[in-house]
Amino acid sequence: MAVARSLRSGESGPRTGSEIRTAFLTFFAERAHQVIPSASLVPEDPTVLLTIAGMLPFKPVFMGQAERPAPRATSSQKCIRTNDIENVGRTARHHTFFEMLGNFSFGDYFKQQAIEWAWELSTEVFGLNPKNLVVSVFREDDEAEAIWRDVVGVNPKRIIRMDEADNFWASGPTGPCGPCSEIYYDFKPDLGNDDIDLEDDGRFVEFYNLVFMQYNRDGEGNLTPLANRNIDTGMGLERMAQILQGVPNNYETDIIYPLIETAAGLAGLDYQKLDDKGKTSFKVIGDHCRAITHLICDGVTASNLGRGYIMRRLLRRVVRHGRLVGIEKPFLQAMGEAAIALMVEAYPQLEERRKLILAELNREEARFLETLERGEKVLADVLVANPQMISGGQAFELYDTYGFPLELTQEIAEEHGLTVDLQGFEQAMDQQRQRAKAAAVSIDLTLQGAIEQMAAELEATRFKGYQVLEQPCCVLALVVNGESAERASAGDNVQIVLDTTPFYGESGGQVGDHGVLSGEGSGGNGVIVAVDDVSRHRNVFVHFGRIERGTLALGDLVNAQVDRACRRRAQANHTATHLLQAALKQVVDSGIGQAGSLVDFDRLRFDFHCSRAVTAKELEQIEALINGWIMESHDLIVEEMSIQEAKAAGAVAMFGEKYADVVRVVDVPGVSMELCGGTHVANTAEIGLFKIVAESSVAAGIRRIEAVAGPAVLAYLNERDVVVKELGDRFKAQPSEIIERVISLQEELKSSQKALTAARAELAVAKSAALATQAVAVGEYQLLVARLDGVEGAGLQNAAQGLLDQLGDATAVVLGGLPDPSDEGKVILVAAFGKQVIAQGQQAGKFIGSIAKRCGGGGGGRPNLAQAGGRDGAALDGALEAAKVELKQSLG
């Protein structure tokens, strides 16, 4: 193994990736830094799809929007970036997935301490020779240069000043910002200190970046010193591993190389003997497998939107590069197993979610292999017909009709020396967006903006709803018609913020409470507000409602009263949701994790990660378990404790969710224990009854169970009774006889359909027998193109095959028709080619697929017999005439 040879066995200090990570965190933990576990790749920041930097989880702290977790922190954060995806595998250090080691100061130590520790860590812990190190500073940062030169003792010739584009960090056009300083490793120090060019990545690699957040930039670009200065640093784990292990690139470190070896073994190749192109494919596989394994683990499933699209794109690139190196069979499960084994020590959750990860890899790989097979056939025809460029329309058709990603079309085109008309593709995509606009739903941005502004300016609402359902409160803010207001009158739809509230605000899947606000009001004649929703914005509770009577003004005192019946129903459904998750884990799979939920007053919905449908028998078992727990009358225990205590006690958390240091734990002893901020019954008996009403798929790898509990079960059963009674009346059968009656009718219908199909087939054969006389001679060949309506696809194929058998191997038969002559929206086309026609280079599948496009469709099949379909019956005669002309030209 190349990596094993490169590791400096016998030398002291960290060398492996695991040792480097541990050494970094230990170094800063010993210097009073709190070790923060890696956050999910799915960030809380809604403006970012994925966690792209080690500092991202701390961004709210740096921006002054959240409390600091500690004065000092350190972490090893998993990250994903895809902006340079085309460079992955082609350069020594580009990756999609990487780990960023970092140390952070939130208003504590600053520039000199950060620089001194960075140097100490690099030279004394990691053992890097100072002669191999070069540092960069911002061109105007005299302070940093002086520290490097006078305090640390770096040779002035190895301190390089850089421009703002390289060495000045900013969170945006305005806000916190500051200069950076970077440490580079010099692989060729013998070249001296003259004309150092840090852009020469063959000689230098940046491995440690120090950001000094010391300024605030206003709208005019002016910089003013921050009252609390911060430190944000990042060291690339993969880059440090390359340096310490002495290998030519990051891919051949012990962090990634085992995955490359696994893939090479599956391909039956020796990686070290491959040319650059072959090695690139294995590097892509190794890199992307790390990324997709962690993405699935963090709850991302493949889709055509957002982070789901990123995961799908990475996974499909893995499959594509696997085929390029000769891996034809499905192999992602093997790669997933290898990735989990490689990274599980640092990320134990990979083992916990192993089944989910492997199931998602298998499913998406199988789906893409089907897409790839279809798309590659079509793309092959496009490549032959377009020797220089693939048009935007063709690329869009591949994307829209066959699910073939644009990036993949570009890659394959590049391999053949072609380009893709990207502008044309975007035009086609834009036309599709315009067509979809009719279905778009707009959001009241004016109202949303007013609420967000209001929430940002107010202190957190004191929530009393766990203890009481009625509470005197003071009106702090009002929004009327999307604008902040001082008063509102009867008939106004309003949004209200109170200093204190018993109303539960929508969160954790549970809907907001309903109820009433009442008081004397500003007019003195009393005010009543009907509250029909409550939401949370930055821990401020916003009450949505309508003023039924009187006038409400800022500062008014009101009595807030929650609708007790609604609250009881929501509580029953929320506790039932916890029992449902516990039952799923017990009956279906202990590794099942929550993907989402809805807790409403009259129903509940639970989404969970699962690679298959829950069987009818399992649903029965789940129902029985839950109703058993309800009848056992378990008292619930609700406690607040530290997140560490909760996890140690076995409390279930929603994966990827970020929790405070102190959490609320809802415990149904011996049954379920979850972290939850929702409202619940005091005893399971209060739920009454539980009934599952549906189980379905909502996305790849995500299932949904819908259910009712309590009084809603009776309403559901009453509705079912009405349906059963109506069916009984229609079928003139007792309820117990309905199923038998339906089966009997189905058998009768099936028999009738079978007889009809047979009759149509006989009719097709009878009609086709007369068609043989219409065959025309084309040189040595026979050509028959005809229209035959009223025949389904199977009958049309039988007719074509019968004509071919009758006319001989030197015959081409093309038949087309409308299965239902009254419906021009469905066209069937069939081609049957004899052996001698096929020998001339004609293939029935390709030929009939191209002809079908004239009818707005497509299709294909075997070289000798193929079927296609279309949607435009009016174009059928023209398509058949085109088929006749093309075959005459090719066979004549």
Swiss-Prot record:
**Residue sites binding Zn(2+) per the record:** H574, H578, C676, H680
Gene Ontology CC: one annotated term? cytosol
Give the co-factor note: Binds 1 zinc ion per subunit.
Q: What class of enzyme is it?
A: ligase
Its subcellular locations are: Cytoplasm
Which key words are in the record?
Aminoacyl-tRNA synthetase, ATP-binding, Cytoplasm, Ligase, Metal-binding, Nucleotide-binding, Protein biosynthesis, RNA-binding, tRNA-binding, Zinc
Q: What cofactors are annotated for this protein?
A: Zn(2+)
Q: Which Pfam families match?
A: DHHA1 (PF02272), tRNA-synt_2c (PF01411), tRNA_SAD (PF07973)
Report the InterPro entries cross-referenced here. aa-tRNA-synth_II/BPL/LPL, Ala-tRNA-lgiase_IIc, Ala-tRNA-ligase_IIc_anticod-bd, Ala-tRNA-synth_IIc_core, Ala-tRNA-synth_IIc_N, Ala-tRNA_ligase, Ala_tRNA_ligase_euk/bac, DHHA1_dom
**Reactions it catalyzes:** tRNA(Ala) + L-alanine + ATP = L-alanyl-tRNA(Ala) + AMP + diphosphate
Name a biological process GO annotation. alanyl-tRNA aminoacylation
What sections of the sequence does the record tag as coiled-coil?
none
Q: What is its EC number?
A: 6.1.1.7
Looking up PROSITE patterns in the UniProt record yields: AA_TRNA_LIGASE_II_ALA
**What GO molecular function annotations does the UniProt record carry, in alphabetical order?**
alanine-tRNA ligase activity; aminoacyl-tRNA deacylase activity; ATP binding; tRNA binding; zinc ion binding
Q: What is known of its domains?
A: Consists of three domains; the N-terminal catalytic domain, the editing domain and the C-terminal C-Ala domain. The editing domain removes incorrectly charged amino acids, while the C-Ala domain, along with tRNA(Ala), serves as a bridge to cooperatively bring together the editing and aminoacylation centers thus stimulating deacylation of misacylated tRNAs.
| Job of this protein | Catalyzes the attachment of alanine to tRNA(Ala) in a two-step reaction: alanine is first activated by ATP to form Ala-AMP and then transferred to the acceptor end of tRNA(Ala). Also edits incorrectly charged Ser-tRNA(Ala) and Gly-tRNA(Ala) via its editing domain.
Protein family per UniProt = Belongs to the class-II aminoacyl-tRNA synthetase family.
Q: Which HAMAP family match?
A: Ala_tRNA_synth_B (MF_00036_B)
Q: What is this protein called?
A: Alanine--tRNA ligase
Organism annotation: Prochlorococcus marinus (strain MIT 9303)
Q: Which gene encodes it?
A: alaS
